[in-house]
């Protein structure tokens, strides 16, 4: 059991792909890719799942400020990448140093 949000997202994506490979793909190399994407997993881990607990999981007005601050400097290379690609790299390659701060209801509960 793991409470790490990033790890939970990667586990969900991997499980979804595994399920697709063994049930829907059925050996067809051209089968429609019907598995959880990074964008889907991010939504479910934030706003989608947060809706169960009230106004959390989003940076919209009137929502609680719950946030994880990530630093991808250790993963940087000389390629300019859009934020979605940078987040995907963090998701799959993060280390403990990637998380630099955590906020719960606006209060910093962890800072590296």
Regions found by a protein language model. Give the residues of each.
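C-terminal cap of metal-dependent C-N hydrolases
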Residues: 64-112
